[in-house]
Amino acid sequence: MPPEATDEALDSLGQAGVVGVRFQMVPNSGNIMAWDDMSPIAQRIAPLGWNINLQLDGRTLADYEALIARQPCRVVIDHVGKFLEPVTPLDPAFAALRRLLDTGNVWVKLSAMYETSRTGAPEYRDVGLLAETLVR
């Protein structure tokens, strides 16, 4: 969604079943949104009940923690934080994810562990440990 999308365009998207805007922030995966666009877009979609779906390298969460936390709409972070190099539950970036979840306005998908796991199936012990920590 371009930041300059009209209200009519948003209404049309909502009528078609759209309920959120995806921010794809993983390097070399398109980066079709800019971090500076997050707040203006969030202000526009919050009254519609939409959410931001955020895909980023979780190792950068601490850099964007304040920005993410202040959004007026729900923010859903993909894939157990999508730490492109798996981290431990003691990592500062994982601590940032946990603080964001504590706000009550940020959610995380416990999905697609295969995308970042280095230990692999069937247990995905590295990324699985993060998911286990989050559900405790």
Short names for language-model regions:
Residues 1-8:
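A metal-dependent hydrolase metal-coordination microenvironment
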Residues 1, 25, 78-82:
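A generic structural motif
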Residues 8-10, 89:
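Short aromatic-enriched loop/helix-cap "lid" or pocket-rim segments at secondary-structure transitions
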Residues 13, 17-33:
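Glycine-rich phosphate-binding "P-loop"
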Residues 19, 34-136:
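Catalytic pocket-lining loop regions of alpha/beta-barrel enzymes
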